[in-house]
Amino acid sequence: MIGRLSGVLLEKNPPQLLVDCNGVGYEVNVPMSTFYNLPGLGEKVALLTHLTVREDAHILFGFGTAEERNVFKQLVKITGIGARTALSILSGMSVADLSNAITLQEAGRLTKIPGIGKKTAERLLLELKGKLGADLGAAGGVIHSDATSDILNALLALGYSDKEALLAMKQVPAGTGVSDGIKLALKALSKA
């Protein structure tokens, strides 16, 4: 397996790159979030990669962060979600946004991504619930655990919007229990 590429960026044609690694040019497909953060042509670039082997091709997918690569790996494990669809999902929303959509069970946010219909969105919510939290907590500044889900559900039940609830969750330290988390979140909301 090829886990990382480091070399000179020769071409950028979204979503594909050509990276020269000591005289060998690797074609790498990247999500748009990674693409927008690339250096200019002729500059050094380092990407974490995932190699997909098919009967007719070996395809490299590159990522700017370990979180993106981990989420990609989780996505391709889901029945009906191929590597191209997983790349489209990561191009359509950030890792933190995807985590929050999964935590809040918001299929509507997922269906806004091209190629993701209602059934696919519901499958994503079902398959990823509880799997992404540990990987993505640091990415979005919000903890993601069973306690988080309970706290978020409590805030939503009290009539706060998704946005307000997520902003309040940023004030709740990781590992906080449900009752203390609700108190801290409500305190943060009262100050807003």
UniProtKB/Swiss-Prot annotation:
It is found in: Cytoplasm. CDD domains: UBA_RuvA_C. It comes from the Bacteria. Gene3D superfamilies: 5' to 3' exonuclease, C-terminal subdomain (1.10.150.20), DNA helicase RuvA subunit, C-terminal domain (1.10.8.10), Nucleic acid-binding proteins (2.40.50.140). SMART domains: HhH1. One of its GO terms (biological process) is DNA repair. Residues 139-142 are annotated as: Flexible linker. It holds the Pfam family HHH_5. Residues 1-64 are annotated as: Domain I. GO terms for cellular component: cytoplasm; Holliday junction helicase complex; Holliday junction resolvase complex. Residues 143-192 are annotated as: Domain III. Residues 65-139 are annotated as: Domain II. Has three domains with a flexible linker between the domains II and III and assumes an 'L' shape. Domain III is highly mobile and contacts RuvB. HAMAP family: DNA_HJ_migration_RuvA (MF_00031). The RuvA-RuvB-RuvC complex processes Holliday junction (HJ) DNA during genetic recombination and DNA repair, while the RuvA-RuvB complex plays an important role in the rescue of blocked DNA replication forks via replication fork reversal (RFR). RuvA specifically binds to HJ cruciform DNA, conferring on it an open structure. The RuvB hexamer acts as an ATP-dependent pump, pulling dsDNA into and through the RuvAB complex. HJ branch migration allows RuvC to scan DNA until it finds its consensus sequence, where it cleaves and resolves the cruciform DNA. This is Holliday junction branch migration complex subunit RuvA. The gene is ruvA.
